[in-house]
């Protein structure tokens, strides 16, 4: 069973409330297979993996926000390209 020192993760994020929010967002990504884990899974649950990633400094709130912005931009670009193609065909 993995041992995660939450105090080390709190020090990386700043406070325990931000830690909870960041870990929950990352765990949800892992659970839905939106992204691959950045640390070995070792048969751990997504919440433990998320905390280990935060503890190692691989994930933080800024990184999560940047990923979401990039995904939104890619989605918007794809939609605009589709609309453009529809207008070109008419």
From Swiss-Prot:
Pfam families: RNA_pol_Rpb6 (PF01192). Signal peptide: none annotated. One of its GO terms (molecular function) is DNA-directed RNA polymerase activity. The keyword Ubl conjugation does not apply. Promotes RNA polymerase assembly. Latches the N- and C-terminal regions of the beta' subunit thereby facilitating its interaction with the beta and alpha subunits. Belongs to the RNA polymerase subunit omega family. This is DNA-directed RNA polymerase subunit omega. It comes from Histophilus somni (strain 2336) (Haemophilus somnus).
